[in-house]
Amino acid sequence: IEFFA
């Protein structure tokens, strides 16, 4: 899970 990638 990536946030602001």
Curated annotation (Swiss-Prot):
Compartments where found: Secreted
Domain of life: Eukaryota
Record's keyword annotation contains Secreted: yes
Function per UniProt: Shows neither neuropeptide activity nor antibiotic activity.
Keywords: Amphibian defense peptide, Secreted
Biological process terms in GO annotation: defense response
Predominant cellular place of this UniProt entry's protein: secreted
Name by which UniProt lists this protein: Rubellidin-2.1
GO cellular component, one term: extracellular region
UniProt tissue specificity: Expressed by the skin dorsal glands.
The keyword Cell cycle belongs to this UniProt entry's keyword annotation: no
